[in-house]
């Protein structure tokens, strides 16, 4: 919408903007924001920034926590969810220094930009295109409570199978039978369509939306391929728009990986490909599934580091309740064509050279997208730099349904981590590929791991309702 500070000022005048909102990202990948009256916004605001306390974002120690947020004019757009006319921008965080401020190397947006620069410096590629698939649930009612005498949750969705007939009109959605189901069974079409229109207005081209497998109200929105750093910004906006549009329709949206026991979990599969001088790096007519050796090495890097990557791509305890057999979620370290049981799937429909790619299927949207996408790029580049061949390392290709193998055959396969603690152990032991070129600071990784360890310990200490069912009367 705008590219320069002058264009932002012009937009404020022409649109009668009353407030200017600055959206920042914390260590968990959640928006925080600060708002100023538009009359106080000047071109100097774009260079001097807005001061904030970074210690509350999880980045800096309290003794050195004063930072400034520098808005990026290219991200300026009108926020459709504010009744008061509001212009919104995201941007980058800077450390206050003399004579010049310097970038906060722990800030997510700075990390994804540093990863892109590292890629260009290697000469391997100059652009990484990614396409995340956003799976989520829409609920009509959700509540939870964690107290000494009461621990539990409840949720409901109009089209959920446990509700049976809707309004006595024979509209029944079968359990696990929700995939691509049409009206009248698709009860949230208008809500999702408005989400996609809002995303398009925000400059995010959308490929499609549709009902997903989970009959309790699971859906998917898929954007088109985009440059990595821009897609990280877009990921934040897609979640923001999804949550706020759902509320407008009297519903609640969640990207939680496994909100419903016995139903399909929600992932964020990430398709990826590299370009150099506009030409595809991953295409080779003579390669397996028409992928080049660089593509295979990139996959090799992802597979070699997949255990440590899981701490970043699946950073919640709930993430690992999704990564179990039986729900089309990946559980095996390997690659294959058109095989959803392997963690890397090569889509057979991507036939043209500039579309040849693969998807990593384990990530979910509880991740910080800036950390996630940057980590995937760094792992893949490490694979290319060290020529890590996935076939030679025994990671496939697995052109069979891995879920149906015998127990003896499954025992030979390498599995994904089964808990966040295990993934954090792997990240502690294997993160040199992330710190190359100073892309991921050691201090950030230490604070991230420590915060997640505390999270794991806190979750483990809470009695679970299912424990009462199993152990109460022993």
Region spans (language model):
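Glycine-rich, acidic/polar active-site loops that bind/position phosphate-bearing ligands
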Residues: 1-474
